């Protein structure tokens, strides 16, 4: 995923929230994404762990014609 991609993020709520990637930082353990959300337009950092599906918080938004 890259800057300006539409994504969904897993938060403490039950539904995923939609946002846009503002920045990407790669680390040995995974990738951090700065994601702008409706309530947080300046962005919040989310970390996707490299080796754990449970540690994946940011995923590409799937458009209806891509399903």
Swiss-Prot record:
Transmembrane segments: none annotated. It comes from the Bacteria. It holds the Pfam family DSRB. InterPro entries: Dextransucrase_DSRB. NCBIfam families: PRK10708.1. Belongs to the DsrB family. This is Protein DsrB.
């Amino acid at each position: 995923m890259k800057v300006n991609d539409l994504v969904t993020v897993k938060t403490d709520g039950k539904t995923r929230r939609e946002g846009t990637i503002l920045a990407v930082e790669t680390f040995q353990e995974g990738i951090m994404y700065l994601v702008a959300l409706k309530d947080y337009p300046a962005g919040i950092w989310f970390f996707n762990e490299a080796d754990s599906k449970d540690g994946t918080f940011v995923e590409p938004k799937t458009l209806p014609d891509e399903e």
